[in-house]
């Protein structure tokens, strides 16, 4: 599905309603202040949240639900502002904070959350390591997840969850997700996350050996720089394949 820039709430609702139940519908994790005719302007990103993706890669939703509830104990104890969603195959947790202009600050806070979860449940957990990408997408609430299905082959919906839902087991969540869940949208908690200042990047001594390559494909310099990182974004990978 092609991306579309919408600037008004009504246009957004019309687009989502037209595509829902036909295809997967996504929107950006982060908001942007400015847009060109066909795309967002990356430099105008509003960095005011961290997106935590608990992904059931092996269809182990019980594991993902366990991890969400562990992290939510910390969130509720600190009264962080949050929203929580079941995506159809995992869970999306947003923690909202004071705006920062350095994505590394968000990544530093994420590492604190990750260390907390590892301390509680161990290294075998469902929290996705990819965080802090301004191009990251997330599923639109109350749209169908075409990659999911119940025992009868019916897909689940991405639905909002509230604090009271944390007492349910995963079967209770799946029952809720069998249809859209139209409840008033509101954030839980009252305290904004204060993203810690990331430590300065220090030079590392020594040399890095570059592996020999066989042949050379013509590639735009900007695309080469985008994919030659430790964890390329989804968009850069897609551009590489299409190139």
Question: What kind of feature is each model-predicted range?
Answer:
Residues 87-91, 132-136, 237:
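Short, conserved alpha-helical segments within structured domains
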Residues 1-89, 95-118, 212-216, 232-235:
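Signature for HUH/AEP ssDNA processing cores
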Residues 46, 50, 136-143, 222:
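Residue-level preference for alpha-helix termini and adjacent loops
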Residues 61, 73, 90-103, 142-149, ...:
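Modules that initiate DNA replication and primer synthesis
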Residues 7, 12-16, 35, 170-173, ...:
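Extended hydrophobic/Leu-rich segments
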Residues 80, 98-157, 163-185:
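Flexible helix-coil linker/hinge segments at domain or subdomain boundaries
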Residues 39-40, 81, 126-127, 226-231, ...:
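Generic recognition of flexible, low-complexity loop/linker segments
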């Amino acid at each position: 599905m092609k991306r579309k820039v919408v600037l008004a709430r009504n246009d957004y609702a019309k687009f989502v309603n037209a595509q829902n139940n036909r295809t997967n519908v996504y929107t950006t994790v982060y908001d942007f202040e400015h847009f060109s005719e066909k795309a967002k302007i990356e430099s105008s990103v509003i960095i005011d949240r961290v997106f935590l993706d608990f992904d059931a890669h092996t269809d182990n939703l019980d594991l993902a639900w366990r991890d969400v509830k562990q992290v939510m104990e910390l969130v509720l104890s600190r009264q962080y502002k949050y929203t929580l969603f079941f995506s159809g195959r995992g869970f999306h947790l947003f923690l909202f904070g004071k705006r920062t202009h350095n994505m590394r600050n968000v990544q530093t806070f994420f590492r604190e959350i990750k260390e907390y979860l590892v301390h509680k449940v161990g290294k075998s957990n469902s929290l996705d390591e990819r965080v802090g990408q301004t191009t990251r997408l997330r599923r639109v609430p109350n749209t169908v997840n075409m990659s999911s299905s119940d025992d009868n082959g019916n897909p689940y919906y991405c639905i909002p969850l509230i604090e009271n839902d944390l007492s349910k087991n995963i079967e209770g969540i799946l029952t809720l997700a069998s249809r859209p869940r139209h409840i008033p949208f509101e954030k839980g908690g009252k305290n904004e996350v204060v993203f810690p200042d990331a430590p300065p990047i220090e030079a590392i001594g020594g040399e890095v050996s570059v592996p020999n390559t066989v042949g050379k494909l013509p590639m735009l310099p900007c695309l080469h720089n985008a994919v030659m990182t430790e964890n390329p974004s989804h968009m850069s990978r897609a551009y590489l394949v299409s190139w």
